[in-house]
Regions:
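Vicinal oxygen chelate
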Residues: 2-9, 23-25, 31-34, 44-48, ...
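Residues that cap or flank secondary-structure elements
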Residues: 9-10, 100
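Hydrophobic ligand-binding cavity/cleft-lining segments
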Residues: 12-23
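Hydrophobic small-molecule pocket/channel-lining residues, especially in calycin-type beta-barrels
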Residues: 52
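Short, flexible/disordered intra-domain loops and linkers
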Residues: 93-103
Length: 145
């Protein structure tokens, strides 16, 4: 049996970064526990001080297939390249003609830029591969391929 995985992202503003990744991946912010209309209601009921309400956020695949992503506040800024990054596979893979993969990737890159991502280096093409390195709004690297 495979082990379930949760990805964890460090952030300065967990709520904002969670919203970005939810939109980027087609995920949704995790619902509050049963019996609570909102996370604010839950946190208030737990006695969590208001200044800590943005200490963390989580997003989930609405179909339940992908991993949960937990976004946690950290005090230090990002200072180096990620040791692990996500690849967003939107091109369709090697069975799709390269020109069509380029079109799909470029279209997704434009959408992600509209959400606040930045293009790190422009498109990279090697043999039959095509991808774009990007940064999320807090500088975490990811690729679109």
């Amino acid at each position: 049996m495979a082990t379930a995985v949760q990805l964890v992202l460090d952030a300065h503003d967990p709520a904002a970064l969670a919203r970005f990744w939810a939109a980027a991946l087609g995920y949704q912010i995790q619902d509050p526990p049963a019996g609570f209309e909102s996370w604010e209601d839950f946190l208030e009921a737990q006695g969590i001080p208001r200044e800590r309400w943005n200490d963390a956020s989580a997003l989930v695949d609405p179909e339940g297939k992908g991993p949960r992503i937990y976004v946690q506040r950290v005090p230090e800024p990002k200072t180096a390249k990620n040791r692990l990054h996500m690849d967003l596979n939107v091109g369709g893979g090697p069975r799709v003609e390269l020109d069509e993969r380029r079109r799909r990737v470029d279209e997704e890159v434009a959408r992600l830029k509209g959400l606040g991502a930045t293009d790190e280096r422009g498109a990279i093409e090697r043999d039959t591969e095509y991808w774009v390195r990007m940064n999320d709004p807090e500088g975490n690297e990811f690729c679109v391929q």
